[in-house]
Amino acid sequence: MAQNVGLQILEKRKGQVVQACGIGDEDTVAITCDKPSVAGSVSQRACTYCGSRVVLYPISDALHLVHGPVGCASYTWDIRGSLSSDRELHRMSFCTDLRENDIIYGGANKLRGALRELIAKYKPEAAFVYSTCVAGLIGDDIDAICREMQAETGISVMNVQSEGFKGTKKDGYLAACDTLSRLVGTAPGPNTASDRSINLLGEFNIAGETWLIQKHLKEMGVEVVAGITGDGRVADIRRAHHARLNVVQCSGSMTSLAKRMQKDYGIPFIRVSFFGLEDTAKAFYDIANHFKDPGMLEVTRTLVKREVNRVMDELRRIRARLEGKRAAIYVGGSFKAISLIRALRQIGVKTVLVGSQTGTAEDYAMLQSICDPGTVIVDDSNPRELSQLSLEKGAELFIGGVKERPMAYKMGMGFCDHNHERKIPLAGFEGTVHFAREVQSSLLSPVWKFARRPL
């Protein structure tokens, strides 16, 4: 049975930190999750605006305009390492730069002028206008302005209702999915997608990961109608309702869109993970099994066997060097954490601490059932908790994002970036080897001999 941890934490957060008792344990304590951050806890979560921005950002032929202060735009500029095979308009940061006078008199004219100028200059396929806290507080009618500019310019101009004060980045995911749902299904013409077609939801082409996955899907005979939103195109998203299956990789950000498309268009969806050898193989098998095509299933078996054999020798060598090492994990979504635990276990690394910013009760129950005895599981944690627990559990490596990097280095431990700022592909079979190499080089770097750990 999962147990509460003895660490001194805020009273209202005690249900968000538990300790698992072992693999296969089904008698678990339900971790408290999916709730607003406790005041004073210094949460690592980002705001609603940031959540919507990271989801829509990879759509590379759309204009992304932030209606708010310049700080909001600069904070999220190039926020994902999402690559594009065509235009790179998404990598340019545009902002209406609301200031004191605009708060008094309104920013509507600034927004109209910015949209006119940018659409005329860059000729995007669509425009997303991100509402920020300031825009929401002064009451600009952004919806009306978007409708006006859409009629004037002839392209879709969409208000992303992402005022930061609404909640956390999880609420931003919902705002982004709501915006995407208004774009899906607007393509003219007949359905030209094949009977074995899918949409890739929640795969953001970080460091080219979408291309690695699509290469194998093409070999299986699967057509990818739209990447939502990795290497995304407005035209592809418009016709995404033609696909026969939605494959959801980042379930936290895209499950709501998948459910909506299931309701509106009858498209089923499956949750998969392309991180780690075991989960990557399962993802391709799940796709093949959905289409009930014996030929596709046989091709998939051959593909998986070939790719696994290609990487296993190196993974065994890395495991021999890392056996018994200990790692801590803190990422955005709990579904990703499940794959990371399995991937680390394959190279001999034990997970002693795992958590996420926006995990669900279902995913945390799964985490508790697969964790080793004594593993601490946290929801919506903060630097103090993460650093203290990492040191107490003897972690030698921290896997997280840009916010956790300085914390790990201050503790004198290795760090592996697994969030959206990274530049190395870690998905798929090839990505599994890259991840193992990253873990190995981080853990075995000679620099840690000279780093003094906090007492």
Question: What is the meaning of each model-derived region?
Answer:
Residues M1-L455:
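An N-terminal assembly and electron-transfer interface module characteristic of large anaerobic redox
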